[in-house]
Amino acid sequence: MSVRLVLAKGREKSLLRRHPWIFSGAVARMEGKASLGETIDIVDHQGKWLARGAYSPASQIRARVWTFDPSESIDIAFFTRRLQQAQKWRDWLAQKDGLNSYRLIAGESDGLPGITIDRFGNFLVLQLLSAGAEYQRAALISALQTLYPECAIYDRSDVAVRKKEGMELTQGPVTGELPPALLPIEEHGMKLLVDIQHGHKTGYYLDQRDSRLATRRYVENKRVLNCFSYTGGFAVSALMGGCSQVVSVDTSQEALDIARQNVELNKLDLSKAEFVRDDVFKLLRTYRDRGEKFDVIVMDPPKFVENKSQLMGACRGYKDINMLAIQLLNEGGVLLTFSCSGLMTSDLFQKIIADAAIDAGRDVQFIEQFRQAADHPVIATYPEGLYLKGFACRVM
């Protein structure tokens, strides 16, 4: 008999709507003992079967659902099916957009909670972010090896959220060769170098692919400021769009060095690209005080909010930095601003930009809205999957 998680009376509604999380407050009791990440059955207070998921006693998310089908076992065949389903959509996208790199598995939205897999050429980069994902590591890797024999697998499960699930951080090769120090990938006509072993996340922000392309329509013969530039994806796209100058700002000299290499790799005019190592908040104030002006500003900061207790502080941070950007824009200039914080809704982010414009003493028009690229889908029953949002704003 399997271990069962019994829900408190009336707490089954979200599961009936196929939401994949069960929070600790919804649990009445456990029937049997389960180890960290082990597969359990989830039942309502009367014992009616609802779902099968992974148990995580150390997390506020007490269980994550693998399947709502009572006949489905969680084994190698299960992961093979899920991977094949996800691959169909990525194959279409890759062919349509000329990609050799994309997000293969987007966690809950691909029916594999706590699992992220990015493909960069013939390297699969794996992040196991939940206890259940870690528990099923061997089955998942076996399925990957069968479906992708040409690919090496590299683990980047060096993410702090694992500690909340009672797990250590892990990183290193799983199968095949080590990735090179910098791996070239292709994106909308650009060649970009990715540091799989030491870069942010899995090495590169694939979720901003379509936003980088959209930037090109605004930049011809314009002076562009690229804030939190990382390895220069927006800068390369701006140069391909015909900008007169792009200034990339980041605190990491290593990232700026790769950004410079990316400009050279694409045979673009390096004299139009400037790379500044500095704190963005500080530099924006310096630019304002000395009267610098730009035609287009890209504002793509790291996540400002990790939990609800940080939300108010994050709102202030987003408002301040966007206010400074708006002050630096010429009349008719365009601000492309983003938030990758899952707790920041699109409506709240839009209000923050409006408040920033008021504080800057400028009017803005919202002219375009952005979200994560199409290889980062959001399943309808899990709206939390929509974490990246952005706006193009015309400053009057």
UniProtKB/Swiss-Prot annotation:
GO molecular function: RNA binding; rRNA (cytosine) methyltransferase activity
Organism: Escherichia coli (strain SMS-3-5 / SECEC)
Gene3D superfamilies, A to Z: PUA domain, RNA methyltransferase domain (HRMD) like, Vaccinia Virus protein VP39
Entry keyword set: Cytoplasm, Methyltransferase, RNA-binding, rRNA processing, S-adenosyl-L-methionine, Transferase
Occurrences of domain PUA (ranges): 2-81
Membership in a protein family: Belongs to the methyltransferase superfamily. RlmI family.
Protein's job: Specifically methylates the cytosine at position 1962 (m5C1962) of 23S rRNA.
InterPro entries (UniProt xref): PUA, PUA-like_sf, PUA_sf, RLMI, RlmI-like_PUA, SAM-dep_methyl-trfase, SAM-dependent_MTases_sf
Protein name in the entry: Ribosomal RNA large subunit methyltransferase I
Top-level taxon: Bacteria
GO cellular component: cytoplasm
Statement: the UniProt record of this protein carries the keyword S-adenosyl-L-methionine: yes
Record EC number: 2.1.1.191
Main location group: cytoplasm
Entry keyword annotation includes Methyltransferase: yes
Stored HAMAP family: 23SrRNA_methyltr_I
SUPFAM superfamilies xref list: PUA domain-like, S-adenosyl-L-methionine-dependent methyltransferases
Catalytic reaction equation(s): cytidine(1962) in 23S rRNA + S-adenosyl-L-methionine = 5-methylcytidine(1962) in 23S rRNA + S-adenosyl-L-homocysteine + H(+)
Localisation per UniProt entry: Cytoplasm
